[in-house]
Amino acid sequence: MRLFNQLKWYFIKEWKRYLGSIILLIIIAFLQLLPPKIIGILIDLIIKEKMSGFEILPWISIILLIAIIVYILRYLWRILLFGASYQLATELRVKFYSYLSKQSEIFFLKNRTGDLIARATNDVDRVVFAAGEGVLTLVDSSVMGISVLIVMITQISWLLTIISLIPMPIMAILIKKYGKKLHDTFRNAQSAFSLLNNQTQEILTSIRMIRAFGLEKNQLKKFNNIVNDTGKKNMEVAEIDARFDPVIYLSVAFSNLLAITAGGWLVWNNTITIGKLTSFIMYLGLMIWPMLALAWMFNIVERGSAAWDRIHSIINQNLYIEDGKKTIINMNGKLNINIDMFFYPKNKKPSLKNIYLSLNPGKTLGICGPTGAGKSTLLKLIQRQFKIHKGEILYNSSSLLELKIDYWRSKIGVVNQTSFLFSDSISNNISLGKPKASQKEIEKAAKLADIHKDIVCLPQGYNTQVGERGVMLSGGQKQRIAIARALLLNTEILILDDALSAVDGKTENNILKNLKKWKDKGYSLIIVAHRLSALIHADEIIVIKEGTIIQRGNHEKLIKEKNWYKSMYDHQKIQTEIENF
Protein backbone atom coordinates (compact mmCIF):
# COMPACT_ATOMS: atom_id res chain seq x y z
CA MET A 1 0.00 0.00 0.00
CA ARG A 2 3.07 2.21 0.36
CA LEU A 3 3.08 2.64 -3.42
CA PHE A 4 -0.15 4.66 -3.38
CA ASN A 5 1.45 7.11 -0.96
CA GLN A 6 4.56 7.27 -3.16
CA LEU A 7 2.42 8.12 -6.20
CA LYS A 8 0.09 10.57 -4.48
CA TRP A 9 1.69 13.43 -6.45
CA TYR A 10 0.29 11.87 -9.62
CA PHE A 11 -3.11 11.04 -8.13
CA ILE A 12 -3.45 14.68 -7.07
CA LYS A 13 -2.47 15.84 -10.54
CA GLU A 14 -5.00 13.55 -12.24
CA TRP A 15 -7.68 13.89 -9.54
CA LYS A 16 -10.47 14.52 -12.07
CA ARG A 17 -9.92 11.16 -13.79
CA TYR A 18 -9.68 9.27 -10.52
CA LEU A 19 -12.66 11.06 -8.96
CA GLY A 20 -14.73 10.33 -12.07
CA SER A 21 -13.74 6.67 -11.83
CA ILE A 22 -14.73 6.47 -8.16
CA ILE A 23 -18.14 8.09 -8.80
CA LEU A 24 -18.85 5.64 -11.62
CA LEU A 25 -17.79 2.76 -9.41
CA ILE A 26 -20.13 3.81 -6.60
CA ILE A 27 -23.00 3.86 -9.10
CA ILE A 28 -21.96 0.41 -10.37
CA ALA A 29 -21.79 -0.96 -6.82
CA PHE A 30 -25.30 0.34 -6.09
CA LEU A 31 -26.67 -1.22 -9.30
CA GLN A 32 -25.04 -4.58 -8.56
CA LEU A 33 -26.72 -4.72 -5.18
CA LEU A 34 -30.18 -4.68 -6.77
CA PRO A 35 -30.36 -8.09 -8.59
CA PRO A 36 -29.78 -10.25 -5.44
CA LYS A 37 -32.38 -8.19 -3.57
CA ILE A 38 -34.90 -8.53 -6.43
CA ILE A 39 -34.29 -12.28 -6.78
CA GLY A 40 -34.72 -12.83 -3.02
CA ILE A 41 -38.06 -10.99 -3.04
CA LEU A 42 -39.23 -12.92 -6.14
CA ILE A 43 -38.37 -16.28 -4.55
CA ASP A 44 -40.38 -15.46 -1.42
CA LEU A 45 -43.35 -14.32 -3.54
CA ILE A 46 -43.20 -17.46 -5.70
CA ILE A 47 -43.02 -19.72 -2.62
CA LYS A 48 -46.05 -17.96 -1.17
CA GLU A 49 -47.73 -18.30 -4.62
CA LYS A 50 -48.28 -14.55 -4.85
CA MET A 51 -46.60 -14.17 -8.28
CA SER A 52 -47.09 -16.01 -11.56
CA GLY A 53 -44.42 -16.85 -14.14
CA PHE A 54 -45.73 -14.16 -16.50
CA GLU A 55 -45.36 -11.50 -13.79
CA ILE A 56 -41.69 -12.40 -13.34
CA LEU A 57 -40.72 -11.33 -16.90
CA PRO A 58 -40.63 -7.53 -16.25
CA TRP A 59 -38.33 -8.11 -13.28
CA ILE A 60 -36.02 -10.26 -15.40
CA SER A 61 -35.95 -7.43 -17.97
CA ILE A 62 -34.96 -5.00 -15.20
CA ILE A 63 -32.10 -7.30 -14.15
CA LEU A 64 -30.88 -7.52 -17.78
CA LEU A 65 -31.08 -3.73 -18.13
CA ILE A 66 -29.03 -3.32 -14.94
CA ALA A 67 -26.41 -5.71 -16.37
CA ILE A 68 -26.17 -3.67 -19.60
CA ILE A 69 -25.85 -0.37 -17.71
CA VAL A 70 -23.16 -1.85 -15.44
CA TYR A 71 -21.23 -3.05 -18.53
CA ILE A 72 -21.32 0.43 -20.12
CA LEU A 73 -20.30 2.18 -16.90
CA ARG A 74 -17.44 -0.27 -16.33
CA TYR A 75 -16.22 0.43 -19.87
CA LEU A 76 -16.22 4.19 -19.24
CA TRP A 77 -14.58 3.69 -15.87
CA ARG A 78 -11.71 1.70 -17.30
CA ILE A 79 -11.11 4.30 -20.03
CA LEU A 80 -10.79 7.02 -17.37
CA LEU A 81 -8.56 4.99 -15.06
CA PHE A 82 -6.28 3.33 -17.60
CA GLY A 83 -5.96 6.57 -19.54
CA ALA A 84 -4.48 8.08 -16.39
CA SER A 85 -2.13 5.13 -15.79
CA TYR A 86 -0.81 5.18 -19.37
CA GLN A 87 -0.12 8.90 -18.98
CA LEU A 88 1.85 8.01 -15.86
CA ALA A 89 4.05 5.72 -17.99
CA THR A 90 4.84 8.62 -20.32
CA GLU A 91 5.62 10.98 -17.46
CA LEU A 92 7.83 8.51 -15.61
CA ARG A 93 9.87 7.67 -18.72
CA VAL A 94 10.27 11.34 -19.67
CA LYS A 95 11.28 12.14 -16.08
CA PHE A 96 13.72 9.21 -16.07
CA TYR A 97 15.32 10.25 -19.37
CA SER A 98 15.44 13.90 -18.30
CA TYR A 99 17.31 12.89 -15.17
CA LEU A 100 19.76 10.68 -17.09
CA SER A 101 20.46 13.47 -19.59
CA LYS A 102 21.60 15.73 -16.73
CA GLN A 103 23.94 13.18 -15.21
CA SER A 104 27.70 13.29 -15.50
CA GLU A 105 29.99 10.55 -16.70
CA ILE A 106 30.59 9.29 -13.16
CA PHE A 107 26.93 8.27 -12.94
CA PHE A 108 27.23 6.06 -16.03
CA LEU A 109 30.43 4.56 -14.70
CA LYS A 110 28.47 3.36 -11.65
CA ASN A 111 25.28 2.25 -13.45
CA ARG A 112 25.17 -0.25 -16.29
CA THR A 113 23.27 0.50 -19.47
CA GLY A 114 21.23 -2.71 -19.32
CA ASP A 115 20.15 -1.97 -15.76
CA LEU A 116 19.02 1.56 -16.68
CA ILE A 117 17.09 0.19 -19.68
CA ALA A 118 15.35 -2.35 -17.42
CA ARG A 119 14.34 0.37 -14.97
CA ALA A 120 13.03 2.62 -17.75
CA THR A 121 10.97 -0.17 -19.35
CA ASN A 122 10.14 -3.18 -17.17
CA ASP A 123 10.05 -1.34 -13.84
CA VAL A 124 7.98 1.52 -15.22
CA ASP A 125 5.50 -1.01 -16.65
CA ARG A 126 5.14 -2.60 -13.21
CA VAL A 127 4.48 0.76 -11.55
CA VAL A 128 1.96 1.72 -14.23
CA PHE A 129 0.20 -1.64 -13.91
CA ALA A 130 -0.11 -1.08 -10.17
CA ALA A 131 -1.35 2.49 -10.69
CA GLY A 132 -3.98 1.18 -13.13
CA GLU A 133 -5.04 -2.33 -12.16
CA GLY A 134 -3.97 -1.77 -8.56
CA VAL A 135 -6.13 1.31 -8.08
CA LEU A 136 -8.97 -0.30 -10.02
CA THR A 137 -8.86 -3.37 -7.82
CA LEU A 138 -8.51 -1.43 -4.57
CA VAL A 139 -11.41 0.91 -5.25
CA ASP A 140 -13.61 -1.73 -6.86
CA SER A 141 -13.11 -4.30 -4.12
CA SER A 142 -13.40 -1.72 -1.32
CA VAL A 143 -16.60 -0.08 -2.57
CA MET A 144 -18.23 -3.36 -3.54
CA GLY A 145 -17.11 -5.16 -0.39
CA ILE A 146 -18.26 -2.41 1.98
CA SER A 147 -21.57 -1.96 0.12
CA VAL A 148 -22.36 -5.67 0.16
CA LEU A 149 -21.34 -5.92 3.80
CA ILE A 150 -23.69 -3.08 4.81
CA VAL A 151 -26.61 -4.64 2.92
CA MET A 152 -25.93 -8.10 4.40
CA ILE A 153 -25.88 -6.68 7.94
CA THR A 154 -28.83 -4.27 7.68
CA GLN A 155 -31.14 -6.05 5.24
CA ILE A 156 -30.66 -9.74 6.06
CA SER A 157 -28.88 -10.76 9.29
CA TRP A 158 -25.98 -9.26 11.19
CA LEU A 159 -25.42 -12.59 12.98
CA LEU A 160 -25.20 -14.57 9.73
CA THR A 161 -22.82 -11.94 8.32
CA ILE A 162 -20.44 -12.16 11.28
CA ILE A 163 -20.44 -15.98 11.18
CA SER A 164 -19.75 -16.03 7.43
CA LEU A 165 -16.81 -13.61 7.70
CA ILE A 166 -14.93 -15.52 10.43
CA PRO A 167 -12.20 -16.70 7.94
CA MET A 168 -11.47 -13.14 6.75
CA PRO A 169 -9.04 -11.97 9.52
CA ILE A 170 -6.94 -15.11 9.05
CA MET A 171 -6.85 -14.49 5.30
CA ALA A 172 -5.79 -10.83 5.83
CA ILE A 173 -2.90 -11.83 8.13
CA LEU A 174 -1.57 -14.40 5.64
CA ILE A 175 -1.88 -12.00 2.70
CA LYS A 176 0.08 -9.31 4.54
CA LYS A 177 2.78 -11.83 5.42
CA TYR A 178 3.09 -13.07 1.83
CA GLY A 179 2.96 -9.50 0.50
CA LYS A 180 6.11 -8.48 2.39
CA LYS A 181 7.96 -11.56 1.16
CA LEU A 182 6.79 -10.88 -2.39
CA HIS A 183 8.12 -7.28 -2.27
CA ASP A 184 11.65 -8.36 -1.32
CA THR A 185 11.73 -11.37 -3.64
CA PHE A 186 10.40 -9.43 -6.62
CA ARG A 187 12.99 -6.71 -6.11
CA ASN A 188 15.73 -9.35 -6.28
CA ALA A 189 14.14 -10.76 -9.43
CA GLN A 190 14.10 -7.31 -11.05
CA SER A 191 17.79 -6.84 -10.21
CA ALA A 192 18.52 -10.19 -11.85
CA PHE A 193 16.51 -9.10 -14.90
CA SER A 194 18.60 -5.92 -15.08
CA LEU A 195 21.77 -8.00 -15.11
CA LEU A 196 20.32 -10.20 -17.85
CA ASN A 197 19.30 -7.14 -19.84
CA ASN A 198 22.77 -5.67 -19.52
CA GLN A 199 24.45 -8.93 -20.58
CA THR A 200 22.16 -9.19 -23.61
CA GLN A 201 22.95 -5.61 -24.59
CA GLU A 202 26.71 -6.22 -24.28
CA ILE A 203 26.57 -9.42 -26.35
CA LEU A 204 24.55 -7.82 -29.14
CA THR A 205 26.85 -4.78 -29.19
CA SER A 206 30.04 -6.84 -29.33
CA ILE A 207 28.81 -9.76 -31.46
CA ARG A 208 31.41 -9.13 -34.19
CA MET A 209 34.25 -9.17 -31.67
CA ILE A 210 32.87 -12.34 -30.06
CA ARG A 211 32.84 -14.08 -33.45
CA ALA A 212 36.29 -12.76 -34.37
CA PHE A 213 37.82 -14.26 -31.20
CA GLY A 214 35.74 -17.44 -31.31
CA LEU A 215 34.14 -16.72 -27.94
CA GLU A 216 30.66 -18.00 -28.79
CA LYS A 217 30.77 -21.00 -26.42
CA ASN A 218 32.33 -19.00 -23.61
CA GLN A 219 29.75 -16.21 -23.88
CA LEU A 220 26.92 -18.75 -24.22
CA LYS A 221 28.00 -20.41 -20.97
CA LYS A 222 28.16 -17.04 -19.20
CA PHE A 223 24.80 -15.99 -20.62
CA ASN A 224 23.26 -19.34 -19.65
CA ASN A 225 24.37 -18.89 -16.02
CA ILE A 226 22.76 -15.45 -15.86
CA VAL A 227 19.56 -16.73 -17.50
CA ASN A 228 19.36 -19.61 -15.01
CA ASP A 229 19.90 -17.26 -12.07
CA THR A 230 17.18 -14.92 -13.37
CA GLY A 231 14.84 -17.87 -13.88
CA LYS A 232 15.56 -19.11 -10.35
CA LYS A 233 14.72 -15.73 -8.82
CA ASN A 234 11.54 -15.46 -10.91
CA MET A 235 10.60 -18.95 -9.73
CA GLU A 236 10.95 -17.75 -6.14
CA VAL A 237 8.49 -14.95 -6.97
CA ALA A 238 6.12 -17.48 -8.56
CA GLU A 239 6.29 -19.72 -5.48
CA ILE A 240 5.22 -16.88 -3.19
CA ASP A 241 2.67 -15.73 -5.75
CA ALA A 242 1.16 -19.22 -5.80
CA ARG A 243 0.38 -19.06 -2.07
CA PHE A 244 -2.20 -16.29 -2.51
CA ASP A 245 -4.92 -18.14 -4.44
CA PRO A 246 -5.23 -21.21 -2.15
CA VAL A 247 -5.63 -18.91 0.87
CA ILE A 248 -8.40 -16.98 -0.90
CA TYR A 249 -10.28 -20.00 -2.26
CA LEU A 250 -10.15 -21.84 1.07
CA SER A 251 -11.40 -18.73 2.86
CA VAL A 252 -14.25 -18.30 0.36
CA ALA A 253 -15.21 -22.00 0.57
CA PHE A 254 -15.21 -21.90 4.36
CA SER A 255 -17.31 -18.71 4.30
CA ASN A 256 -19.89 -20.37 2.03
CA LEU A 257 -19.97 -23.46 4.25
CA LEU A 258 -20.60 -21.33 7.34
CA ALA A 259 -23.23 -19.23 5.51
CA ILE A 260 -25.20 -22.24 4.28
CA THR A 261 -25.00 -24.05 7.64
CA ALA A 262 -25.88 -21.04 9.79
CA GLY A 263 -28.38 -19.74 7.22
CA GLY A 264 -30.19 -23.09 7.12
CA TRP A 265 -30.47 -23.03 10.90
CA LEU A 266 -31.89 -19.45 10.81
CA VAL A 267 -34.46 -20.46 8.15
CA TRP A 268 -35.41 -23.52 10.24
CA ASN A 269 -36.06 -21.19 13.18
CA ASN A 270 -37.99 -18.73 10.96
CA THR A 271 -35.47 -15.96 11.67
CA ILE A 272 -34.99 -15.32 7.94
CA THR A 273 -36.84 -16.48 4.82
CA ILE A 274 -35.53 -18.74 2.06
CA GLY A 275 -35.56 -15.70 -0.25
CA LYS A 276 -33.35 -13.74 2.14
CA LEU A 277 -30.96 -16.71 2.45
CA THR A 278 -30.80 -16.87 -1.35
CA SER A 279 -30.04 -13.13 -1.49
CA PHE A 280 -27.39 -13.60 1.22
CA ILE A 281 -25.66 -16.41 -0.73
CA MET A 282 -25.70 -14.19 -3.86
CA TYR A 283 -24.28 -11.27 -1.87
CA LEU A 284 -21.62 -13.58 -0.50
CA GLY A 285 -20.86 -14.46 -4.12
CA LEU A 286 -20.35 -10.75 -4.78
CA MET A 287 -17.94 -10.72 -1.82
CA ILE A 288 -15.77 -13.34 -3.52
CA TRP A 289 -14.42 -10.78 -6.00
CA PRO A 290 -13.35 -8.28 -3.30
CA MET A 291 -11.60 -11.09 -1.43
CA LEU A 292 -9.85 -12.39 -4.55
CA ALA A 293 -9.10 -8.84 -5.63
CA LEU A 294 -7.57 -8.06 -2.26
CA ALA A 295 -4.93 -10.74 -2.69
CA TRP A 296 -4.33 -9.86 -6.33
CA MET A 297 -4.05 -6.18 -5.45
CA PHE A 298 -1.45 -6.87 -2.76
CA ASN A 299 0.43 -8.94 -5.31
CA ILE A 300 0.63 -6.31 -8.06
CA VAL A 301 1.05 -3.39 -5.65
CA GLU A 302 4.00 -5.05 -3.92
CA ARG A 303 5.57 -5.69 -7.33
CA GLY A 304 4.89 -2.10 -8.30
CA SER A 305 6.33 -0.84 -5.02
CA ALA A 306 9.54 -2.83 -5.53
CA ALA A 307 9.79 -1.48 -9.08
CA TRP A 308 9.16 2.09 -7.87
CA ASP A 309 11.95 1.72 -5.29
CA ARG A 310 14.34 0.83 -8.12
CA ILE A 311 13.22 3.79 -10.25
CA HIS A 312 13.23 6.20 -7.32
CA SER A 313 16.72 5.10 -6.25
CA ILE A 314 17.97 6.47 -9.58
CA ILE A 315 15.96 9.66 -10.03
CA ASN A 316 16.35 10.62 -6.36
CA GLN A 317 20.14 10.73 -6.51
CA ASN A 318 21.70 14.15 -6.22
CA LEU A 319 23.29 15.44 -9.40
CA TYR A 320 27.08 15.07 -9.25
CA ILE A 321 27.54 18.25 -11.29
CA GLU A 322 25.55 21.18 -9.95
CA ASP A 323 24.07 23.54 -12.52
CA GLY A 324 25.07 27.19 -12.61
CA LYS A 325 22.76 30.11 -13.29
CA LYS A 326 24.84 32.39 -15.49
CA THR A 327 25.02 32.92 -19.25
CA ILE A 328 27.44 35.13 -21.18
CA ILE A 329 26.21 37.39 -23.95
CA ASN A 330 29.66 38.14 -25.41
CA MET A 331 30.69 35.67 -28.09
CA ASN A 332 34.11 34.04 -28.62
CA GLY A 333 35.56 34.34 -25.14
CA LYS A 334 38.94 33.42 -23.75
CA LEU A 335 39.33 30.04 -22.06
CA ASN A 336 41.61 29.92 -19.01
CA ILE A 337 42.48 26.57 -17.45
CA ASN A 338 43.95 26.61 -13.94
CA ILE A 339 43.93 23.10 -12.48
CA ASP A 340 46.00 22.58 -9.34
CA MET A 341 44.77 19.05 -8.67
CA PHE A 342 42.16 16.60 -9.95
CA PHE A 343 41.35 13.11 -8.69
CA TYR A 344 38.93 10.60 -10.17
CA PRO A 345 36.43 9.35 -7.57
CA LYS A 346 37.95 6.72 -5.23
CA ASN A 347 41.44 7.33 -6.68
CA LYS A 348 44.16 8.53 -4.31
CA LYS A 349 46.63 9.46 -7.04
CA PRO A 350 45.87 12.72 -8.91
CA SER A 351 45.06 12.30 -12.60
CA LEU A 352 45.98 15.93 -13.35
CA LYS A 353 48.12 18.45 -11.51
CA ASN A 354 49.48 21.90 -12.25
CA ILE A 355 47.71 22.36 -15.60
CA TYR A 356 47.77 26.05 -16.48
CA LEU A 357 47.04 27.36 -19.98
CA SER A 358 44.93 29.81 -22.00
CA LEU A 359 43.13 29.62 -25.33
CA ASN A 360 42.29 32.85 -27.13
CA PRO A 361 39.53 33.16 -29.75
CA GLY A 362 40.65 32.08 -33.22
CA LYS A 363 43.60 30.05 -31.88
CA THR A 364 44.43 26.35 -31.93
CA LEU A 365 45.64 24.38 -28.93
CA GLY A 366 47.33 21.04 -29.57
CA ILE A 367 47.51 18.40 -26.84
CA CYS A 368 49.64 15.27 -27.02
CA GLY A 369 51.41 12.83 -24.76
CA PRO A 370 51.69 9.12 -23.95
CA THR A 371 48.61 6.92 -23.59
CA GLY A 372 46.98 7.41 -20.19
CA ALA A 373 48.73 10.72 -19.57
CA GLY A 374 45.49 12.61 -18.83
CA LYS A 375 44.65 14.21 -22.18
CA SER A 376 41.05 12.99 -22.35
CA THR A 377 40.63 13.75 -18.64
CA LEU A 378 41.47 17.40 -19.33
CA LEU A 379 38.85 17.50 -22.09
CA LYS A 380 36.25 16.01 -19.74
CA LEU A 381 36.93 18.77 -17.23
CA ILE A 382 36.50 21.39 -19.95
CA GLN A 383 33.11 19.79 -20.73
CA ARG A 384 32.23 19.81 -17.00
CA GLN A 385 31.96 16.04 -16.76
CA PHE A 386 33.69 16.02 -13.37
CA LYS A 387 34.37 18.39 -10.48
CA ILE A 388 37.81 19.96 -10.11
CA HIS A 389 39.12 19.43 -6.58
CA LYS A 390 41.59 22.33 -6.60
CA GLY A 391 41.52 24.99 -9.27
CA GLU A 392 39.03 26.22 -11.84
CA ILE A 393 38.35 26.75 -15.54
CA LEU A 394 37.27 30.22 -16.66
CA TYR A 395 35.48 31.38 -19.78
CA ASN A 396 35.35 35.11 -20.39
CA SER A 397 36.58 35.54 -16.79
CA SER A 398 33.58 33.56 -15.47
CA SER A 399 34.06 30.22 -13.71
CA LEU A 400 32.42 27.28 -15.47
CA LEU A 401 30.77 26.51 -12.12
CA GLU A 402 28.76 29.73 -12.51
CA LEU A 403 27.56 28.93 -16.03
CA LYS A 404 24.47 26.93 -16.87
CA ILE A 405 25.58 23.51 -18.05
CA ASP A 406 23.29 23.50 -21.11
CA TYR A 407 24.52 26.95 -22.06
CA TRP A 408 28.20 26.03 -21.71
CA ARG A 409 27.87 22.78 -23.64
CA SER A 410 26.11 24.65 -26.43
CA LYS A 411 29.33 26.66 -26.79
CA ILE A 412 31.54 23.63 -27.37
CA GLY A 413 31.47 20.96 -30.05
CA VAL A 414 33.15 17.64 -29.26
CA VAL A 415 34.24 14.86 -31.60
CA ASN A 416 35.62 11.74 -29.94
CA GLN A 417 37.88 9.09 -31.41
CA THR A 418 35.04 6.56 -31.38
CA SER A 419 32.30 8.33 -33.30
CA PHE A 420 28.72 7.34 -32.52
CA LEU A 421 26.26 7.46 -35.40
CA PHE A 422 22.54 6.75 -35.12
CA SER A 423 20.75 4.25 -37.34
CA ASP A 424 19.51 6.97 -39.68
CA SER A 425 20.48 8.77 -42.87
CA ILE A 426 23.80 10.59 -43.25
CA SER A 427 21.92 13.88 -43.55
CA ASN A 428 20.06 13.35 -40.27
CA ASN A 429 23.25 12.28 -38.49
CA ILE A 430 25.03 15.48 -39.55
CA SER A 431 22.06 17.67 -38.61
CA LEU A 432 21.53 15.91 -35.26
CA GLY A 433 22.28 19.02 -33.21
CA LYS A 434 20.54 21.35 -35.66
CA PRO A 435 17.49 19.48 -37.02
CA LYS A 436 16.23 22.46 -39.04
CA ALA A 437 19.51 22.93 -40.91
CA SER A 438 19.13 23.40 -44.66
CA GLN A 439 20.70 21.01 -47.15
CA LYS A 440 23.12 23.77 -48.12
CA GLU A 441 24.30 24.11 -44.51
CA ILE A 442 24.68 20.33 -44.18
CA GLU A 443 26.75 20.11 -47.36
CA LYS A 444 28.92 23.05 -46.29
CA ALA A 445 29.76 21.29 -43.01
CA ALA A 446 30.42 18.04 -44.91
CA LYS A 447 32.84 19.84 -47.24
CA LEU A 448 34.73 21.31 -44.29
CA ALA A 449 35.05 17.78 -42.88
CA ASP A 450 36.19 16.50 -46.31
CA ILE A 451 33.39 13.93 -46.48
CA HIS A 452 31.15 15.53 -49.12
CA LYS A 453 32.85 13.83 -52.08
CA ASP A 454 32.47 10.43 -50.39
CA ILE A 455 28.78 11.01 -49.69
CA VAL A 456 27.82 12.05 -53.23
CA CYS A 457 29.39 8.85 -54.55
CA LEU A 458 26.98 6.73 -52.50
CA PRO A 459 23.84 5.48 -54.34
CA GLN A 460 21.46 7.54 -52.19
CA GLY A 461 23.86 10.35 -51.35
CA TYR A 462 22.95 12.18 -48.16
CA ASN A 463 19.87 9.96 -47.75
CA THR A 464 22.01 6.83 -47.38
CA GLN A 465 21.20 4.84 -44.24
CA VAL A 466 24.33 4.29 -42.16
CA GLY A 467 23.03 1.23 -40.26
CA GLU A 468 23.29 0.62 -36.54
CA ARG A 469 26.15 2.70 -35.11
CA GLY A 470 27.25 3.51 -38.67
CA VAL A 471 28.13 -0.08 -39.53
CA MET A 472 27.77 0.63 -43.27
CA LEU A 473 30.62 3.18 -43.20
CA SER A 474 34.37 2.97 -42.66
CA GLY A 475 36.00 4.30 -39.51
CA GLY A 476 37.35 7.35 -41.33
CA GLN A 477 33.96 8.15 -42.84
CA LYS A 478 32.28 7.92 -39.45
CA GLN A 479 34.86 10.27 -37.93
CA ARG A 480 34.41 12.83 -40.70
CA ILE A 481 30.61 12.73 -40.43
CA ALA A 482 30.99 13.33 -36.69
CA ILE A 483 33.29 16.30 -37.42
CA ALA A 484 30.73 17.69 -39.89
CA ARG A 485 28.03 17.29 -37.23
CA ALA A 486 30.08 19.37 -34.78
CA LEU A 487 31.00 22.01 -37.37
CA LEU A 488 27.35 22.51 -38.33
CA LEU A 489 26.67 23.81 -34.81
CA ASN A 490 29.11 26.74 -35.22
CA THR A 491 30.20 26.42 -31.60
CA GLU A 492 32.78 28.82 -30.20
CA ILE A 493 35.14 25.99 -29.28
CA LEU A 494 35.65 22.77 -31.27
CA ILE A 495 37.34 19.84 -29.53
CA LEU A 496 38.77 16.96 -31.57
CA ASP A 497 39.73 14.12 -29.23
CA ASP A 498 41.96 12.05 -31.51
CA ALA A 499 39.16 12.42 -34.07
CA LEU A 500 41.52 12.16 -37.06
CA SER A 501 43.06 8.82 -36.10
CA ALA A 502 41.13 6.81 -38.72
CA VAL A 503 41.81 9.06 -41.73
CA ASP A 504 44.84 8.99 -44.01
CA GLY A 505 47.47 11.73 -44.09
CA LYS A 506 46.07 13.46 -47.17
CA THR A 507 42.53 13.61 -45.78
CA GLU A 508 43.87 14.81 -42.43
CA ASN A 509 45.73 17.62 -44.18
CA ASN A 510 42.58 18.64 -46.11
CA ILE A 511 40.50 18.75 -42.92
CA LEU A 512 43.10 20.81 -41.05
CA LYS A 513 43.30 23.31 -43.92
CA ASN A 514 39.51 23.67 -43.87
CA LEU A 515 39.50 24.04 -40.10
CA LYS A 516 42.10 26.83 -40.37
CA LYS A 517 39.67 28.82 -42.55
CA TRP A 518 36.88 28.02 -40.09
CA LYS A 519 38.75 29.17 -36.97
CA ASP A 520 39.91 32.37 -38.65
CA LYS A 521 36.33 33.60 -38.09
CA GLY A 522 37.07 33.75 -34.36
CA TYR A 523 36.39 30.15 -33.35
CA SER A 524 38.82 28.23 -31.12
CA LEU A 525 40.11 24.74 -31.76
CA ILE A 526 41.49 22.10 -29.39
CA ILE A 527 43.10 19.06 -31.02
CA VAL A 528 44.20 15.99 -29.08
CA ALA A 529 46.26 13.68 -31.26
CA HIS A 530 48.67 10.79 -31.11
CA ARG A 531 49.69 11.48 -34.71
CA LEU A 532 51.70 14.67 -34.28
CA SER A 533 51.29 15.74 -37.91
CA ALA A 534 47.83 16.97 -36.88
CA LEU A 535 49.41 19.48 -34.46
CA ILE A 536 52.09 21.08 -36.66
CA HIS A 537 50.08 24.25 -37.33
CA ALA A 538 48.72 24.66 -33.77
CA ASP A 539 49.43 28.02 -32.13
CA GLU A 540 50.45 26.24 -28.94
CA ILE A 541 51.15 22.60 -28.17
CA ILE A 542 51.29 21.10 -24.70
CA VAL A 543 52.75 17.70 -23.90
CA ILE A 544 51.11 15.96 -20.93
CA LYS A 545 52.82 13.10 -19.14
CA GLU A 546 51.65 11.49 -15.89
CA GLY A 547 49.00 14.19 -15.47
CA THR A 548 51.22 17.26 -15.77
CA ILE A 549 52.58 19.47 -18.56
CA ILE A 550 56.20 18.59 -19.38
CA GLN A 551 56.53 20.70 -22.55
CA ARG A 552 54.79 23.62 -24.19
CA GLY A 553 55.32 25.79 -27.26
CA ASN A 554 54.66 25.64 -31.00
CA HIS A 555 55.93 22.90 -33.31
CA GLU A 556 59.12 24.75 -34.30
CA LYS A 557 60.07 25.24 -30.66
CA LEU A 558 59.31 21.72 -29.50
CA ILE A 559 61.28 19.87 -32.21
CA LYS A 560 64.37 21.75 -31.09
CA GLU A 561 64.06 20.38 -27.56
CA LYS A 562 65.33 16.91 -26.74
CA ASN A 563 62.22 15.56 -25.09
CA TRP A 564 59.11 13.44 -25.66
CA TYR A 565 57.71 15.55 -28.53
CA LYS A 566 60.85 15.49 -30.72
CA SER A 567 61.43 11.81 -30.03
CA MET A 568 57.85 10.88 -30.99
CA TYR A 569 57.80 13.21 -34.02
CA ASP A 570 61.03 11.74 -35.41
CA HIS A 571 59.76 8.22 -34.81
CA GLN A 572 56.48 8.90 -36.63
CA LYS A 573 58.30 10.65 -39.47
CA ILE A 574 60.54 7.64 -40.07
CA GLN A 575 57.53 5.32 -39.83
CA THR A 576 55.67 7.37 -42.45
CA GLU A 577 58.68 7.34 -44.80
CA ILE A 578 58.94 3.55 -44.49
CA GLU A 579 55.21 3.13 -45.22
CA ASN A 580 55.46 5.39 -48.27
CA PHE A 581 58.60 3.68 -49.57
Swiss-Prot record:
The lineage of its organism: Bacteria, Pseudomonadati, Pseudomonadota, Gammaproteobacteria, Enterobacterales. The gene is mdlA. The keyword GTP-binding does not apply. One of its GO terms (molecular function) is ATP hydrolysis activity. Keywords: ATP-binding, Cell membrane, Membrane, Nucleotide-binding, Translocase, Transmembrane, Transmembrane helix, Transport. Its EC number is 7.6.2.2. PROSITE patterns: ABC_TM1F (PS50929), ABC_TRANSPORTER_1 (PS00211), ABC_TRANSPORTER_2 (PS50893). It catalyses: ATP + H2O + xenobioticSide 1 = ADP + phosphate + xenobioticSide 2. It comes from the Bacteria. This is Multidrug resistance-like ATP-binding protein MdlA. ATP binds at residues 369-376.
